């Protein structure tokens, strides 16, 4: 199953980017990262709608979509791994994870998402969310393959 991470904004060099890459390299094949950015000076609802368009344009046809959202479901690592396993076992070829901009996701992303996922009620910096997601993808892989990285 191929994994795509589509994110608003360009990653800057730093420890968050290093951590993201470290976890992605552990996965085979590693997730593909697509970064989108709106250059025009839009604000509020217009910006969210435009960022949603840009994110949705990155999706492979038929992909399952997970939107990272502070109002999403807060699930454990094992449940997350099982969700990915179930999609894989049902023949899903692509899963796309969408990370919105500073104002969150536009309605179009929320409507398209198969899962709205939260990493808790706290607000996280977008670059750190990438690293958290990559770690959880590695952890899910570890859970599903019996690798000792994840200890229940």
Swiss-Prot record:
Give compartment(s): Cytoplasm
Instruction: Please list the reactions this protein catalyses.
Output: pseudouridine(1915) in 23S rRNA + S-adenosyl-L-methionine = N(3)-methylpseudouridine(1915) in 23S rRNA + S-adenosyl-L-homocysteine + H(+)
What Pfam families does this protein's entry cite? SPOUT_MTase
Summary of the function given for this chain in its UniProt record:
Specifically methylates the pseudouridine at position 1915 (m3Psi1915) in 23S rRNA.
Give Gene Ontology CC terms. cytoplasm
Q: This chain belongs to which protein, by name?
A: Ribosomal RNA large subunit methyltransferase H
Q: Which family does it belong to?
A: Belongs to the RNA methyltransferase RlmH family.
Q: Which domain of life is it from?
A: Bacteria
Matching HAMAP family, A to Z? Answer: 23SrRNA_methyltr_H (MF_00658)
Q: Which UniProt keywords apply?
A: Cytoplasm, Methyltransferase, rRNA processing, S-adenosyl-L-methionine, Transferase
The organism of origin for this protein: Paramagnetospirillum magneticum (strain ATCC 700264 / AMB-1) (Magnetospirillum magneticum)
Gene designation: rlmH
Q: Could you tell me one molecular function GO term of this UniProt entry?
A: rRNA (pseudouridine-N3-)-methyltransferase activity
Q: What class of enzyme is it?
A: transferase
Residues binding S-adenosyl-L-methionine are 68, 100, 119-124
Which segment of the chain is annotated as a signal peptide?
Answer: none
What does the subunit section of this Swiss-Prot or TrEMBL entry state?
Answer: Homodimer.
Q: Classify the main location.
A: cytoplasm
Report the EC number(s), separated by commas if there are several.
2.1.1.177
Query: What InterPro entries is this protein classified in?
Result: Alpha/beta_knot_MTases, RlmH-like, tRNA_m1G_MTases_N
